[in-house]
A protein has these predicted regions:
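Bacterial Sec-dependent signal peptides at the C-terminal "C-region" and cleavage site
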Residues: 4, 8-20
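An exposed, glycine/acidic-rich loop-and-rim segment of catalytic or binding clefts
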Residues: 18-374
Length: 374
């Protein structure tokens, strides 16, 4: 049985017309190497607490109580801004202009060829990953608290930045509801044709203990198909059915149950690092995934308007990164559930288009909803 946190339920029951309980505060987090101040924002509704910083539009932390009422941070990351400046694993970050991979770091648009930095080489095969060498995760955004008790972060990516055409104006909004939903919404416009796939890249361990693996977490994905890849983790262009394979999470499944299976996709990715094609739903967002930790009782549902979700199982975490409270983040100590457009979409005409043109608005809606299960 899934139940929201009790105190919030009581508040809603007794005062259905009351204003949101969410409070938002800000303070100086530190300084960039050039001396520019960086803010950190705290959103809390009395049960859930989220922190967001202007650097990288990063979700710094997310705390919720377990079934015994003990709160813990469920995310990987760093204690200080100085730590975040070394963030090479995209912990908590807003990544773009194009999240995920682009084959060979090349694409063509309206008859013109573009070359991006190749900053990733799975299987020894170079590709462009998560926007480039200095993507959205490594720049300073301008933040403010809105009248709606949300945090809005703005960044203008110049024409030609990291090789992408067009000046792109991006607004990212983080908000926290009384229903224990953390919402992340992106809106972007351009002054010239470009490609866009902006992704939220938080690493989750619902146990609240970053020294444990997520292999005992239970995952459900609202997807009947996934994108097989080549040795460089670039989609082949096919959509394969998950039925009868270790990629089938249509029913709640322990993540580590089939990691050792003799299956090509798992061998190529060193585990799970693939995009699943989501079933379409009604409304602005639809159910994408549910993650549950049996030990703590914590559950997280994911809703989005995007066509795919990437499950990255933390396969390349190696125990060398010193994170929060001195924790060493080992292999599979957290996972990412990245709602997204299809990887390498600019080079695959049969994939949903990632092209954004002047006069259009790119929108990515993502909701993480937290609850407890007995």
């Amino acid at each position: 049985m899934i139940r929201p946190f009790q105190r919030i339920l009581l508040a809603v029951t007794h005062s259905p017309a009351m204003e949101s309980k969410t409070k938002v505060t800000s303070k100086i987090y530190g300084e960039m190497p050039n001396g520019r101040e960086v803010k950190i924002y705290t959103l809390t509704n009395g049960e859930v607490k989220a922190k967001v910083t202007e650097y990288g539009a990063i979700l710094v932390s997310l705390e919720t109580p377990d079934k015994d009422g003990k709160s813990a941070d469920l995310t990987h990351g760093y204690d200080t801004l100085e730590g975040w400046l070394t963030n090479s694993s995209y912990f908590g970050a807003t990544v773009g202009r194009f999240g995920n991979r682009i084959k060979d770091g090349k694409f063509s648009l309206d008859g013109k060829n573009y070359t991006l930095a190749t900053n990733n080489d799975p299987g020894g095969i170079p590709c462009a990953l998560h926007g480039g060498i200095k993507g959205f995760d490594k720049v300073l955004w301008d933040g403010k608290i809105t009248e709606e008790k949300a945090v809005e972060l703005t960044y203008i990516s110049a024409d030609g930045e990291e090789g992408y055409p067009g000046a792109l104006t991006v607004h990212v909004t983080y908000s926290l509801t009384d229903a224990n939903e953390l919402k992340w919404v992106v809106k972007a416009t351009t002054d010239a044709p470009t490609i866009v796939n902006i992704i939220q890249h938080t690493y989750w361990n619902l146990s609240g203990d970053p020294t444990t693996q997520i292999t005992d977490h239970i995952l459900t994905l609202n997807a009947d198909g996934y994108l097989p890849t080549d040795a460089g983790l670039i989609p082949t262009g096919k959509i394969d059915p998950v039925e009868g394979t270790p990629m089938d999470f249509t029913k709640p499944t322990v993540i580590g149950e089939r990691l050792g299976a003799d299956f090509e996709a798992l061998k190529l990715g060193g585990g799970y690092d693939h995009a699943w094609v989501l079933k379409k739903g009604e409304g602005k967002t639809h159910f994408a995934a549910r993650l549950m930790d049996p030990k703590s009782g914590r559950s997280m549902e994911v809703f989005t308007n995007q066509p795919a979700i990437q499950l990255y199982g933390g396969n390349f975490l190696n125990g060398e990164t010193v994170g929060k409270n001195g924790a060493l983040y080992g292999k599979r100590s957290a996972l990412a559930l990245e709602t997204e457009g299809f990887p390498d979409a600019p080079n695959q005409s049969n994939f949903p288009s990632s092209v954004l043109r002047p006069g259009e608005t790119y929108e990515h809606h993502l909701t993480f909803k937290f609850s407890l299960e007995k």
